[in-house]
A protein has these predicted regions:
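Short S/T/G/P-rich N-terminal loop/turn motif that feeds into the first structured element of a domain
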Residues: 1-56, 67-73, 89-208
Length: 208
């Protein structure tokens, strides 16, 4: 995996396999690990299970650019796994992709670049923590989207929330108590689609 100082691209892939098909999905995940490890541009990846629905999974990835992500879409084994998932194993999925605008770890803020205009619904905050974060910690500035815990580490949580607007996102990112989280990241979502509504998906030649 490579590291870049450029603005990062976040990908959130939420998937619900058909009943009895979870292991098929996880088998494909294992087969793709060696490909991902050697693929240029992947900065970070972790997988989670929904806290209140153990059939729903999340793959959260950080890429160094849209170009690198596009190259991964064209990987042969990735395309085979994707086709099998869509045709046989997935009941539904949702993909959200966007540029990371800000990242806060402990008391340090980095990668801040708010000189953009975004629709309220196009912003997404991911909050990584070592435990469940109560709704009261963010309800003034955002609404809860979903909560996941680590697939291989039950003490790794990620909470996805939708800020009311950019000002609320700024306030939450800068003021949440550092006792509650390990990292907060703000993304401007440019593509958001599900299995049956792919208006914002790449063309058939460039599936995600």
């Amino acid at each position: 995996m490579s590291v870049s100082n450029k603005a990062l691209i976040g990908l959130f892939f939420e998937v619900v396999p058909y009943s009895g098909h979870l292991n098929h999905y996880l088998n494909y995940v294992e087969k793709l690990k060696p490909e991902l490890e050697k693929h240029k541009g992947l900065i970070w990846l972790n997988r989670y299970r929904a806290l209140f629905d153990d059939q729903c999974l999340l793959s959260h990835q950080l890429w160094d650019s849209e170009k690198s992500l596009g190259h991964w879409r064209q990987n042969k084994l990735h395309r085979i796994a994707q086709k099998a998932g869509i045709e046989k194993h997935f009941k539904d999925y949702r993909i959200r992709i966007g540029e990371r605008l800000a990242c806060r770890q402990a008391d340090m803020v980095t990668d801040v670049s708010f000189e953009i205009t975004s629709k309220p619904g196009a912003l997404l905050l991911s909050i990584q923590s070592g435990g469940f974060i109560p709704n009261t910690a963010f309800s003034k500035h955002a609404s809860l989207d979903s909560v996941y815990c680590g697939l291989s580490a039950s003490d790794q949580f990620i909470t996805l929330v939708t800020p009311n607007n950019l000002s609320s996102a700024l306030a939450l990112t800068s003021t949440m108590s550092s006792d509650l989280f390990a990292k907060i990241e703000l993304f401007s979502i440019s593509r958001n689609y599900i299995m049956t509504e792919r208006d914002q998906a790449p063309s058939a030649k460039h599936h995600e």
